[in-house]
A protein has these predicted regions:
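C-terminal substrate-binding subdomain of Rossmann-fold SDR/epimerase-dehydratase oxidoreductases
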Residues: 230-234, 238-350
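Conserved Rossmann-fold NAD(P)-dependent oxidoreductase catalytic core, especially the SDR/UDP-sugar
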Residues: 130-177
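N-terminal Rossmann NAD(P)H-binding glycine-rich loop of SDR-like oxidoreductase domains
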Residues: 29-49
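Active-site helix of classical SDR
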Residues: 177, 181-184
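NAD(P)H-binding glycine-rich loop region in Rossmannoid oxidoreductase-like domains
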Residues: 85-124
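Conserved beta-loop-beta element that borders a ligand/cofactor-binding pocket
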Residues: 149, 186-212
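A conserved pocket-lining segment of Rossmann-fold NAD(P)-dependent short-chain dehydrogenase/reductase
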Residues: 113-114, 167-174, 200-215, 225-249, ...
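Amphipathic terminal alpha-helices
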Residues: 1-24, 45, 55-58, 336-350
C-alpha cells in the first residue's frame, strides 16, 4: 500500500526531531499495544522508519486483536504481530522474553460502545492495563508509556488545567466507563511505578487526528465527520450547540510526545499532550473547517438528533489543557487546527 506523501513527511519530521533520544532505542525490543489502531500504528510506523534510517537494530512487536489488520500491518511494516487481546495478555500468551519499551495504546474508544458496552470498556482499561504492566515487570521493561485521555479531568473545571487538577466524574453516567477506566488505569500505572520501580508515564492526549487516521466510516468522531463534509461538499452538521471546548493534537505531534516520554518522562507522572493554542469550542472548530479548509463553500448548521444520548458524546467542557510540562521536555506542536484537517484530508486523497 502506497504511503501518502503527507504521512511520509510527518514521519521524516519526527525522525529529525532532536529532542527524541533515539540512541536509547538501540538494540531494543519495543512492544506497542493496540498497534492496529491510529496511535499505535503511528508509533510503530515511526519506530520502523527509525530502525532503517538510524540503524537501530530494533525489534517492534505490534499487539492487536484483529488478525486481518495485523497481517496487513506485518506486510507493510517490519513488525512482528502479536495476535492477542490485552485482557488475555500474559507472559505465556505474549511469547516474549524481552521488552525494553512498552507503549500501551490499546483500549475501546468508540463512543457508542461506551454507552452500549460499558463493562467491556471498563474491564479492557483496567484489566488490560494491569496485564500490560505485569508483563512489563516480568520482562524488565525500562519504560512504559500509557496513552490516557483528557477525559480523566471530568467536569467542573474551567480555564487552563494542569496535570494536578481534577474535576468530578459521575460513575453512574451513561458513558462514564471511559473516563473512569482511564483514571483507574492511570492509578495502576502510578502504583506499579511505586511498588515495582517500573518507569511509567501517563500521556493525557487531547482529541487526536491528522494524516495517518484512515477514513473509516465506522469512526464517527467529530474531526472525521467534519472532514467528510469537506470532501462531499456538504454543510457541517452539529448534533449539539457546539459550546463545549475541545483540546486537539495532530497525530504526528502526539507520536513525538509519546516517544519523548519513553526516554525523558518522569516516572509515575502524567503529562498533558495537546496544542493549547488550537483549543476552541466545537462550534468554532466547525467554522474554521468550513471557512479555511472548505474555502467558505459549506456552512455550519445545527441538527439535534432524537437519539442524542445513545450516541455517547462526552459532556461539554470549558477547560483548556496546560502543556508546559511536556514542553519542558522539548516538545512543541507543529500544526494548528486548519492544517491538521488539511493534512488529514490530503492523506485521504492520496
Amino acid at each position: 500500500m502506497a504511503v501518502p506523501d503527507v504521512l511520509r513527511d510527518d514521519v521524516e519530521r519526527t525522525l529529525n526531531e532532536p529532542a527524541i533520544l533515539w540512541d536509547r532505542f538501540r538494540s531494543a525490543t519495543v512492544l506497542v499495544t493496540g498497534a492496529t489502531g491510529v496511535i499505535g500504528n503511528g508509533i510503530a510506523r515511526v519506530l520502523c522508519a527509525a530502525n532503517v534510517s538510524k540503524d537501530l537494530d530494533l525489534t517492534v512487536v505490534a499487539q492487536g486483536r484483529d488478525i486481518v489488520k495485523g497481517r496487513r500491518l506485518e506486510a507493510e511494516l517490519d513488525v512482528r504481530f502479536l495476535a492477542a487481546g490485552v485482557r488475555e495478555l500474559s507472559l505465556a500468551t505474549s511469547g516474549l522474553d524481552k521488552a525494553d519499551f512498552v507503549f500501551h495504546t490499546a483500549g475501546v474508544t468508540s463512543s457508542a460502545c461506551m454507552v452500549a458496552q460499558p463493562q467491556e470498556v471498563l474491564e479492557t482499561a483496567v484489566d488490560g492495563t494491569r496485564n500490560v504492566l505485569d508483563l512489563a515487570v516480568a520482562l524488565g521493561a525500562s519504560s512504559v508509556v500509557y496513552v490516557s485521555s483528557m477525559e480523566v479531568y471530568g467536569q467542573g473545571l474551567a480555564g487552563l488545567v494542569a496535570e494536578s487538577d481534577l474535576g468530578s466524574l459521575d460513575p453512574d453516567g451513561p458513558r462514564s466507563s471511559y473516563p473512569e477506566g482511564k483514571r483507574r488505569a492511570e492509578a495502576l500505572s502510578a502504583a506499579y511505578a511505586t511498588k515495582y520501580g517500573l518507569h511509567t508515564t501517563n500521556a493525557r492526549l487531547g482529541l487526536t487526528f491528522g494524516a495517518g487516521v484512515p477514513n473509516d466510516l465506522d469512526n464517527t468522531r467529530v474531526p472525521l465527520q467534519f472532514a467528510r463534509s469537506v470532501l462531499a461538499g456538504h454543510d457541517i452538521e452539529l448534533h449539539t450547540d457546539g459550546a463545549g471546548v475541545t483540546n486537539v493534537c495532530y497525530l504526528a505531534d502526539a507520536v513525538r510526545a509519546l516517544l519523548l516520554l519513553a526516554t525523558k518522562g518522569a516516572a509515575g507522572e502524567a503529562y498533558n499532550v495537546a496544542n493549547s493554542q488550537a483549543s476552541m469550542t466545537i462550534r468554532q472548530m466547525a467554522e474554521v473547517v468550513a471557512r479555511e479548509v472548505a474555502g467558505g463553500t459549506i456552512n455550519v448548521v445545527v441538527k439535534k438528533p432524537e437519539d442524542l444520548e445513545s450516541r455517547g458524546y462526552a459532556p461539554p467542557s470549558s477547560y483548556r489543557l496546560a502543556t508546559g510540562k511536556i514542553r519542558a521536555l522539548g516538545w512543541e506542536p507543529r500544526y494548528g487546527m486548519a492544517e491538521m484537517y488539511q493534512r488529514m484530508i490530503a492523506s485521504w486523497r492520496s
